[in-house]
C-alpha cells in the first residue's frame, strides 16, 4: 500500500531526480501534485526541473563519488534518472545497498550504452533489429560499412538526442560520418554502432508503462526527426492491427527484460505489418511530449504513478494530437518569448516554455501542442503555434 508523507517533514516521501531537463521538469510537477518531496540534481544550475523542485544540487553526474555523496546525504526513497549521462556503476552499487533506482539500475546501465541494449534485444531476446556491427577504430568501422553497404547509419554507442548520428549514402560520407560520431559521443571519442538501413514506412515511440497492475501501452506516437533530433510528434499514429500487436509484443519483451516500474519509450521501425526494435529509454521520451495534450494522464503522470506504486486503471486518449518543437538558435542567457497571444489564438492549443537558463548554438526551448479533427490538421496547428512564437535573444 502506497503511503505519502508531508514534504519537508520527517514523514516525507523523497524522490531524487538525476538530470533536470524539460522532461524531468514535468515529472517533478506530477510528483509535487502528489505531495512528494523532490530533490533535483544536474551538472548546471537553474536547470528546468530545479526550478520546480524543493531543492537542488549541482554536480558532475559522471562523478560516482559526487553522486554517491548527494544520495547518501539526501536518503531518497526513489532515485529517478532522467538522462543517460550518469555514473551508472554507482547506481548499481547503491541499488545493491538498498536504494531503489527507477526502473532498475541495470536498465539505466544497459540503456546508457547502445551496445548493451542492442545485444539484449537482438541476441538475448531474439527480437528483430537492423543488421549491425560495433567498431572502435576507423579501420573496423570502414570494414563494417563495406559489409553492410549503403545506405547505413552510424551512431556513437553513448550519445543522446541524435548527437553524432549520420546517414551514409556513399563512400564520400565515410570519413565525415566517423568524425561527427567521434565528436558526438557523451564520453568523447569512442566506440560506434553501424546499422544497416531499414527502408521503413514510419517510426513510432510506443510509450510503455510497467506499474503495480501490470503493463499498459499508450496509443502509438509517430514522429519526424532531423539529424536524429525530434522536430514534431503526433498521436495516434495509424497502424495495422497486426503491426500494433507486434509492436506491443516487442515493447513488452524489452521492458520485461529491463524490469522495475516506470514509463519506457520504446522506439520501433514499421514497414507494413513488420516491426523492428530500434532503441528504448527507461524514462519519459521527448516525442511523448504530445501526451501533455493527447491523454488524460500524460507520460509524466504515468511515470509518477508507476514510481509510487499507484494504479493505472485506464489511459484516456483524446484523439488526433500533435507537438512541434520551438527551436532557438543563437547565444543568450536572457531569452524571451513574445507573440504568445497569436501562438495560442486557436482552440485546443497549448505551449510549454522550458525555462532553460541559456542557449549557445541550437537548443529546444519549448514545445507547441495541439488537438484537431485529424492528425494532419493537428500537426499543422501545432506547427503554426510553434512558428508564431517570437524569440528574443
UniProtKB/Swiss-Prot annotation:
Record-annotated residues binding Mg(2+)? 267, 279
What InterPro entries is this protein classified in? Answer: ATP-grasp (IPR011761), ATP-grasp_carboxylate-amine (IPR003135), ATP_grasp_subdomain_1 (IPR013815), PreATP-grasp_dom_sf (IPR016185), PurT (IPR005862), PurT/PurK_preATP-grasp (IPR054350), PurT_C (IPR048740)
Q: GO annotations under biological process?
A: 'de novo' IMP biosynthetic process
For this UniProt record, the keywords arranged alphabetically read as follows:
ATP-binding, Ligase, Magnesium, Metal-binding, Nucleotide-binding, Purine biosynthesis
Q: Which GO terms describe its molecular function?
A: ATP binding; magnesium ion binding; phosphoribosylglycinamide formyltransferase 2 activity; phosphoribosylglycinamide formyltransferase activity
Under the cellular component aspect of Gene Ontology, which terms does the record hold? cytosol
Q: Which PROSITE patterns match?
A: ATP_GRASP
Which SUPFAM superfamilies does the entry link to?
Glutathione synthetase ATP-binding domain-like, PreATP-grasp domain
Residues recorded as binding ATP, renumbered to this chain, are: 114, 155, 160-165, 195-198, 203
EC number(s) given by UniProt: 6.3.1.21
Give every ATP-grasp domain span: 119-308
Question: Can you tell me which residues bind N(1)-(5-phospho-beta-D-ribosyl)glycinamide?
Answer: 22-23, 82, 286, 356, 363-364
Hey, which pathway is this one from?
Answer: Purine metabolism; IMP biosynthesis via de novo pathway; N(2)-formyl-N(1)-(5-phospho-D-ribosyl)glycinamide from N(1)-(5-phospho-D-ribosyl)glycinamide (formate route): step 1/1
Q: Which reactions does this protein catalyse?
A: N(1)-(5-phospho-beta-D-ribosyl)glycinamide + formate + ATP = N(2)-formyl-N(1)-(5-phospho-beta-D-ribosyl)glycinamide + ADP + phosphate + H(+)
Give the quaternary structure.
Homodimer.
Give the record's family classification: Belongs to the PurK/PurT family.
Extract the HAMAP family matched here. Answer: PurT
What function is annotated for this protein?
A: Involved in the de novo purine biosynthesis. Catalyzes the transfer of formate to 5-phospho-ribosyl-glycinamide (GAR), producing 5-phospho-ribosyl-N-formylglycinamide (FGAR). Formate is provided by PurU via hydrolysis of 10-formyl-tetrahydrofolate.
- Per its UniProt record, what NCBIfam families does this chain match? PRK09288.1, purT
**Can you name this protein?**
Formate-dependent phosphoribosylglycinamide formyltransferase
Q: Which organism is it from?
A: Pseudomonas fluorescens (strain ATCC BAA-477 / NRRL B-23932 / Pf-5)
User: Gene for this protein?
Assistant: purT
